[in-house]
Amino acid sequence: MIKNLPQIVLLNIVGLALFLSWYIPVNHGFWLPIDADIFYFFNQKLVESKAFLWLVALTNNHAFDGCSLLAMGMLMLSFWLKENAPGRRRIVIMGLVMLLTAVVLNQLGQALIPVKRASPTLTFTDINRVSELLSVPTKDASRDSFPGDHGMMLLIFSAFMWRYFGKVTGLIALIIFVVFAFPRVMIGAHWFTDIIVGSMTVILIGLPWVLLTPLSDRLITFFDKSLPGKNKHFQNK
């Protein structure tokens, strides 16, 4: 019997209900006005403020994705530096399991969710596009934006940080998620619901089976025992 089965099932139900609240209604029901209002709010700001235009352009440049990796790496590094050699190895392996989980859930989400939709910049007409207002390389559109894969990866990171390093670290990771995921919404490359519905659906249905069961711990232990190297956490067991 899985110890946290009631919590897992509840989170799965919430995730499914969240998705169906968006998927079943005609034109996505109450979600579409929310999506449209958020898009038009930020889209109008692009021509009202040059500073905002540049902010959105730069935070959607591919180099900014590297900054998100740096932020995640620095947070993990702060714990890695405090550990002894076996503990450092275990943190690295935890990162490997986190990456593996992100890849699997992202692929499952893309394959199983029966949705394909273009970003708001490719849906609405008579709008402002950063790529037309500035000559800066930036991502302001997507032909298939649902679910938001970038937001999903950052949410998985946040959940792993919460699970293995505590609530405060999890909250810091959530700040990283907001800072690096929502510029995609501000520029119009993603709908708000690509993240709040799409990414969250995959997270609520898939991730509890990894983090609220022994699976993640067992994977970490397996890789610790199997991968070459010194300072294995379980080498004397």
Language-model segments: which ranges?
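Membrane-water interface at transmembrane helix exits
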Residues: 39, 43, 73-77, 105-114, ...
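Alpha-helical transmembrane segments of integral membrane proteins
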Residues: 9-10, 89-98, 169-172, 193-197
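Interfacial segments of alpha-helical transmembrane regions
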Residues: 71-110, 203
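Membrane-embedded catalytic cores of phosphoryl/pyrophosphoryl-handling enzymes
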Residues: 2, 132-237
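N-terminal transmembrane-helix/juxtamembrane module of multi-pass inner/ER membrane proteins
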Residues: 1-71, 110-140, 228-237
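Aromatic-anchored segments of alpha-helical transmembrane domains
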Residues: 17-22, 99-104, 177-188
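Membrane-interface helix-loop-helix junctions at transmembrane boundaries of multi-pass membrane enzymes
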Residues: 2-6, 80-92, 162, 166-168
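Hydrophobic alpha-helical transmembrane segments
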Residues: 60-80, 150-153
